């Protein structure tokens, strides 16, 4: 007979003694269990002790976390967190450097435990650590190693969010900033210093001001030219944090400073085009920098043109002058009157494609795109003058009904690009889709506009469009751009080539192909056949998911970015009635046997499956402090009485497999993206196989009519 669910069998170790094999009743108070363990070894004062895990990060066990103890777990009897904190507090201030170094090593390890961290912080432990850093006594032996452990402990303690970052002194900030600015500083010290500064900036506006005064752009950029991608990532993360928290009136100054120090080209050459693959966290930081850079355009995008502002009107005059040359300026003509000049201006503004021919300034009063559209037009006219003049003159010489209005097109195109690139929106925590081509030019948005306005003009000609077709052309251009961007061209020239291949005829072909594929499967007979086949396909997918669960998968345990990963394995019994699981020393290369998995949970006890932020192990820390992909890969099984089994899938595929399989076990619909994809693929294949004999045969919308009954049934023969 299996033991009750409240009883867990564990081994408890104590240095110099034989391990105790104990059955722990989870309903008993933890203090009572600790007393029983101490009595087994004749240890006095059981209140001085506690239990913690023997493996991994060796976390302390509390009344709140004791439910995580599983059968077969090896525990240690250890001194209580309060005593450990007190002893480490004394040892970290010892005059013996070896003692102090050992204490710092242990402190850096224990600080990841929130139970210990709370005790240590309550003893003003953070103040002690900051003073040790502030003293900066470099003459001490093991200085670099000791400092690295001190900064690690400080960062771990602050990560728990128990105390505010505002308690940090200006002296401490100067000291940490000094490690970032010093040449040839130890890599581990530099990494932790960058991480501490980033956390300070993100968590405190007042600290942002102080750090911005201490750290220069040049100091951070120098760390991007190293070969260590982790240091590069932390440096860009700090740059992004400073950029994000800077007041709006300071952001443009920061961008100018970055441009002067060639930040973009350094990132391009040393990070994007480096010899190492871009890791997920680096890709996210590059995406954030890309978004923050484009967000500098928001002010101009939301600024309306003032029709009475002469400086702004002069820009429109400049556009006209460049397009039609100063020689044609009516003000230069002898005896030119005001009315004649106005008529000439109106004619020119019409040829420039403005909607309001008399006062084109009114075209820029809509936001978005506001003044940003005028900025783009002026950039094109001055930097790519030949292209600008060609587009304007080419359209002004066409028949009226086929001319592409440059002014209106430029305004709508600018608005479209702002929508596609989401100018003005904050970075998304879960995204990492940066575009390398935007790091190849200091004026990437303006260059992108220049490429796309030529695309628009080309597409207009290919469509033989008229003014009535303007919106249709813009829809095609949007489709061309959005189809080209996912290929992530490495340069603007590659992007231009990709757009060239997506001509109007190619877009029509793609649309037709997609529409035909869709239409083929929308006729009533096909829909009826599809509905008949779908349950069979879903059952096939369900069996595949359950078979994968029976094979099992390895999962990593939740951990801090500075801790070594630990793994556990879970697989479904062949009769689909029990989940077997257990801890592993390493990530397994093959299948793990049922016999080696000590724990099990009956499927009948499962109450629900939760995902993402609803998971208990995701609520311990905020999403900002988690790895960017963890939330999307997390799920938990809630089972009787009030237990949880927490998972972090190794990838999105395994996540979908397990969510589908567990849903199928509970009799629920499989709703993952993978199921939808598999269903579409398998249904499409099955439908095509069944319809092979009907190739080139028109399938009628309705079944053929039933013929009338014959006048007699004399043709019927009855077999005797």
Swiss-Prot record:
CDD domains: PH_ELMO1_CED-12 (cd13359). It is found in: Cytoplasm; Cytoplasm, Cytosol; Membrane. InterPro entries: ARM-like (IPR011989), ARM-type_fold (IPR016024), ELMO_ARM (IPR024574), ELMO_dom (IPR006816), ELMO_domain-containing (IPR050868), PH-like_dom_sf (IPR011993), PH_domain (IPR001849). It comes from the Eukaryota. Residues 553-674 form the PH domain. The modification Phosphotyrosine is found at residues 48, 717. Involved in cytoskeletal rearrangements required for phagocytosis of apoptotic cells and cell motility. Acts in association with DOCK1 and CRK. Was initially proposed to be required in complex with DOCK1 to activate Rac Rho small GTPases. May enhance the guanine nucleotide exchange factor (GEF) activity of DOCK1. This is Engulfment and cell motility protein 2. It comes from Pongo abelii (Sumatran orangutan). The lineage of its organism: Eukaryota, Metazoa, Chordata, Craniata, Vertebrata.
């Amino acid at each position: 007979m299996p033991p009750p669910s409240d009883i867990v069998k564990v081994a408890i170790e104590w240095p110099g003694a034989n391990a105790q094999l104990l059955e722990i009743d989870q309903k008993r108070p933890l203090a009572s269990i600790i007393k029983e363990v101490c009595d087994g070894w004749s240890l006095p004062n059981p209140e001085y002790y506690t239990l913690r895990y023997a493996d991994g990060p060796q976390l302390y066990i509390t009344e709140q976390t004791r439910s995580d103890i599983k059968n077969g777990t090896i525990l240690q009897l250890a001194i209580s967190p309060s005593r450990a904190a007190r002893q480490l507090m004394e040892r970290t201030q010892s005059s013996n450097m070896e003692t102090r170094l050992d204490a710092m090593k242990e402190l850096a390890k224990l600080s990841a435990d929130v139970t210990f961290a709370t005790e240590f912080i309550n003893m003003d432990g953070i103040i002690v650590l900051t003073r040790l850093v502030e003293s900066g006594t470099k003459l001490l032996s093991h200085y670099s190693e000791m400092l690295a452990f001190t900064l690690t402990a400080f960062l771990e303690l602050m990560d728990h969010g128990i105390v505010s970052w505002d308690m940090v002194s200006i002296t401490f900030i100067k000291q940490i900033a000094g490690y970032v600015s010093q040449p040839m500083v130890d890599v581990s010290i530099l990494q932790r210093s960058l991480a501490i500064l980033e956390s300070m900036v993100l968590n405190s506006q007042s600290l942002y001001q102080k750090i911005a005064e201490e750290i220069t752009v040049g100091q951070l950029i120098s760390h991007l030219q190293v070969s260590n991608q982790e240091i590069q990532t932390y440096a860009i993360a700090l740059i992004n944090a400073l950029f994000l928290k800077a007041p709006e009136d300071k952001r443009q100054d920061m961008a100018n400073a970055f441009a002067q120090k060639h930040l973009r080209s350094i990132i391009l050459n040393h990070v994007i085009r480096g010899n190492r693959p871009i890791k997920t966290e680096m890709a996210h930081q590059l995406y954030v920098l890309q978004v923050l850079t484009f967000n500098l355009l928001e002010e101009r995008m939301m600024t309306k043109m003032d029709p009475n502002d002469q400086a702004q009107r002069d820009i429109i005059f400049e556009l006209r002058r460049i397009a039609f040359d100063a020689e044609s300026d009516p003000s230069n003509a002898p005896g030119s009157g005001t009315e004649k000049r106005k008529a000439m201006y109106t004619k020119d503004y019409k040829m420039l494609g403005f909607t309001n021919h008399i006062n084109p300034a009114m075209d820029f009063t809509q936001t978005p795109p506001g003044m940003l559209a005028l900025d783009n037009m002026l950039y094109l006219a001055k930097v790519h003058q030949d292209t600008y003049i060609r587009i304007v003159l080419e359209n002004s010489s066409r028949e009226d009904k086929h001319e592409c209005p440059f002014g209106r097109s430029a305004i709508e195109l600018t608005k479209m690009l702002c929508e596609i690139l989401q100018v003005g929106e904050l970075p998304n925590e879960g995204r990492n889709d940066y575009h390398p081509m935007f790091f190849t030019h200091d004026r990437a948005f303006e260059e992108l506009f220049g490429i796309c306005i030529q695309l628009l003009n080309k597409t207009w000609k290919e469509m033989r469009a008229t003014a009535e077709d303007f919106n249709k052309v813009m829809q095609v251009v949007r489709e061309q751009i959005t189809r080209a961007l996912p290929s992530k061209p490495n340069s603007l020239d590659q992007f231009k080539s990709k757009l060239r291949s997506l001509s109007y005829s190619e877009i029509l072909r793609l649309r037709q192909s997609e529409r035909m594929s869709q239409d083929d499967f929308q006729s009533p007979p096909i829909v009826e056949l599809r509905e008949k086949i779908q349950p069979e396909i879903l059952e096939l997918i369900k069996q595949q998911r359950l078979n994968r669960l029976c094979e099992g998968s390895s999962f990593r345990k939740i951990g801090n970015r500075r801790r070594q990963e630990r793994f556990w394995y879970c697989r479904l019994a062949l009769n689909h009635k029990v989940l077997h699981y257990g801890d592993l020393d390493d990530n397994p290369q093959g299948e793990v046997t049922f016999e080696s998995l000590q724990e099990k949970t009956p499927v009948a006890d499962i109450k629900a499956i939760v995902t993402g932020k609803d998971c208990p192990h995701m609520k311990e820390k905020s999403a900002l402090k988690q790895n960017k992909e963890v939330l999307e890969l997390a799920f938990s099984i809630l089972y009787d009485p009030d237990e949880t089994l927490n998972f972090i899938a190794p990838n999105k595929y395994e996540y979908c497999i397990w969510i589908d399989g567990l849903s199928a076990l509970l009799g629920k619909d499989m709703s993952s993206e993978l199921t939808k994809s598999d269903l579409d693929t398998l249904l499409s294949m099955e439908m095509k196989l069944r319809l092979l004999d009907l190739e080139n045969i028109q399938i009628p919308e309705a079944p053929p009519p039933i013929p009338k009954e014959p006048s007699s049934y004399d043709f019927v023969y009855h077999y005797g």
